[in-house]
Design a protein with these regions (language model features):
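C-terminal alpha-helical interaction appendages
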Residues: 1-60
Length: 60
């Protein structure tokens, strides 16, 4: 299922927009059967990095 918040990200997106898109993507991913939080987070961060071109080291 497409995530409009993730789809809207680009190189001009702000940190709060990026964080919201990542959270939304993780939430959607976790609804899938057999989903694991670590895998969903990795997927979401990877998508956000690709869309924004930013390193995204939140929480480190």
């Amino acid at each position: 299922m497409p995530n409009p918040k993730m789809d809207a990200l680009n190189e001009n997106s702000t940190d709060p927009q990026i964080q919201e898109a990542i959270s939304s993507e993780i939430e959607m991913c976790m609804k899938e059967p057999g989903a694991e939080q670590k895998a969903c987070a990795g997927k979401a961060y990877g998508m956000a990095r690709e869309k924004t071109g930013k390193e995204l080291n939140y929480g480190q």
